[in-house]
From Swiss-Prot:
Family of this protein: Belongs to the universal ribosomal protein uS4 family.
Entry keyword annotation includes Isomerase: no
InterPro entries: Ribosomal_uS4, Ribosomal_uS4_bac-type, Ribosomal_uS4_CS, Ribosomal_uS4_N, S4_RNA-bd, S4_RNA-bd_sf
Domain S4 RNA-binding: 91-154
Gene: rpsD
A matching Pfam family: S4
Annotated GO biological process: ribosomal small subunit biogenesis; translation
Subunit composition and interactions: Part of the 30S ribosomal subunit. Contacts protein S5. The interaction surface between S4 and S5 is involved in control of translational fidelity.
GO molecular function, one term: rRNA binding
Keywords: Ribonucleoprotein, Ribosomal protein, RNA-binding, rRNA-binding
Stated name of the protein: Small ribosomal subunit protein uS4
Length: 199
């Protein structure tokens, strides 16, 4: 299954969740379409699990193959599978570029990483799925510091998670530790996703 490339605001309304973290994509809290107000069908148990999976998958902008591979990796780790899964997603380079405020949205962060604008511990990394380790430092390449998209995003940043620190003078952030569950998206019930893949 390929990555969704259609209108994200329509997808957000269909899933009932903000995909970009701003809430602007879900101002109208009902599904798109002529009968959106009356189109909230009662979902089966499978439908509820599937919808939860789709929420998280589209939130991070992954295709099914990438998403499932991350879940399988989480299943092999010690601890709670659902929380491990969320932590692996939060540890992605594109997500941390977004969390640190280098980009206004995850899709924008993914594109910036793809174009080679960031360094991890001083080395260029252009793989959005790169797994950042606690203690790793993410910075902007010298020749990319003048990019207006990055400058505007940093100036507009209003929140910084507790599991990252940011040096404004150096324009670099450090992933200090893996996030606790309460620091990850509260609108996601990862237990339903574990149940979906355990069917």
């Amino acid at each position: 299954m390929s990555r969704y490339t259609g209108p994200r605001h329509k997808l957000a309304r269909r899933l009932g969740i903000s995909l970009d973290g701003t809430g602007k994509d879900i101002k109208r809290n009902f599904p798109p379409g002529q009968h959106g107000h009356n189109n909230r069908r009662k979902l089966s148990e499978y439908g509820i699990q599937l919808q939860e999976k789709q929420k998280l998958r589209h939130m991070f902008g992954l295709n099914e193959k990438q998403f499932r591979r991350t879940f399988d990796n989480a299943s092999k780790m010690a601890g709670v599978v659902g929380e491990n899964f969320m932590k692996l997603l939060e540890s992605r380079l594109d997500n941390l570029v977004y969390r640190m405020g280098f980009a206004p949205t995850r899709p924008a962060a993914r594109q910036l990483v793809n174009h080679g604008h960031f360094l991890v511990n001083g080395k260029k990394v252009n793989i959005p799925s790169y797994r950042v380790q606690p203690g790793d430092v993410i910075s902007i390449r010298e020749k990319s510091r003048g990019l207006q998209l990055i400058k505007d995003a940093l100036e507009g940043r209003t929140f910084l998670p507790n599991y990252v620190t940011f040096n404004d003078a150096a324009a670099e952030g450090t992933f200090t530790r893996l996030p606790d569950r309460e620091e990850m998206p509260a609108e996601i019930n990862e237990v339903l996703i574990v149940e979906f893949y355990s069917r």
